[in-house]
Design a protein with these regions (language model features):
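Extended alpha-helical scaffold/assembly modules in large eukaryotic proteins
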Residues: 174-178, 182
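Long amphipathic alpha-helical segments
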Residues: 134-141, 197, 215-224
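Conserved NTPase motor "head" modules and their coupling/switch loops across ABC/AAA+ ATPases, GTPases
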Residues: 204-241
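Residue-level detector of functional hotspots within protein domains
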Residues: 25, 185, 219
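Conserved amphipathic alpha-helical "coupling/scaffold" segments
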Residues: 1-175, 202-213
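Generic detector of short, locally flexible boundary/turn motifs and exposed helical patches
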Residues: 7-9, 198-201, 227-231
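Phosphate-/polyanion-interacting regions in eukaryotic proteins
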Residues: 181-204
Length: 241
């Protein structure tokens, strides 16, 4: 990525994130994303503009695309996944004897940590299935940015332990055993944590594209202005004293 050099004074002059007179600033137009991480990514796009015309066009084409999907998970589910992945308690490799030995204890005693792990595992499994389905069914005419995201999903899943998770959970309604939950938990929170972070970034990218698309529709904004390499510009009847 090649970024445009900017400074604090430029941000202030353009009223990017704040104004001197409590007026509406630019970011407020596009800050109503559906997720917290999407909002952070949107701010990053605005605060660090690109100077590469090709990359700018990719973003524009993705934003204007009328087939942008609904977010694959809702905000609460995504927040819980983020919380679960950041949760550091009881990270250990799965052992079938330990999993079996703790079954009765888990049935008779409520364990908040176990709740986080069980729900987190189920939501991550659901996330993997949603992303796999989206990447597989992406139409040929999709914008390049969406194709790149789908390719990233395929590269991460193909031939990895995460692909094995998809195969083992083809029926998402099927109850997972304690041992399988423990095995998946170690995989998600330790072995393939960074891969899951990359996969989550696709959801936030969709959020960032959907938000200006929605704003542009509501306010009749132009999504893709005509951009040229060179132009002739002249001013007449202007006097400077």
């Amino acid at each position: 990525m090649v970024y445009l050099a900017t400074d604090k004074q430029t941000y202030a002059d353009l009223s990017i994130t704040e104004t001197a007179n409590n007026e509406q600033f630019l970011f407020s137009l596009f800050s109503k994303t559906e997720t917290k991480e999407g909002k952070a990514l949107m701010l990053n796009w605005i605060m660090y503009p690109l100077s590469d015309l090709g990359e700018i066009r990719k973003r524009q084409e993705a934003i204007v695309w009328d087939a942008l999907p609904e977010l694959l998970l809702n905000e609460e589910e995504l927040d819980f996944i983020e919380y679960y992945l950041a949760y550091r308690d009881q990270i250990r490799e799965a052992h079938i004897l330990l999993s079996c030995a703790t079954v009765i204890d888990r049935l008779v005693r409520y364990d908040s940590t176990r709740y986080v792990i069980c729900r987190g595992v189920k939501l991550v499994v659901h996330l993997l299935h949603c992303l796999k389905e989206w990447a597989t069914e992406l139409p040929q005419g999709a914008p390049q940015l969406m194709k790149e995201s789908a390719a990233m999903i395929d590269n991460i899943l193909h031939g990895s332990e995460l692909e094995e998770v998809l195969e083992q959970t083809s029926d998402e309604e099927k109850r997972l055993s304690n041992f399988v939950i423990d095995k998946f938990d170690y995989l998600f929170r330790c072995t393939r944590l960074l891969s899951l972070k990359e996969l989550l970034s696709v959801i936030y990218l969709l959020d960032v594209c959907r938000t200006p698309h929605r704003v542009a529709k509501e306010k009749s904004f132009c999504c893709i202005p005509v951009m040229v390499q060179t132009m002739h510009f002249s001013v007449e009847g202007f006097v400077h004293t």
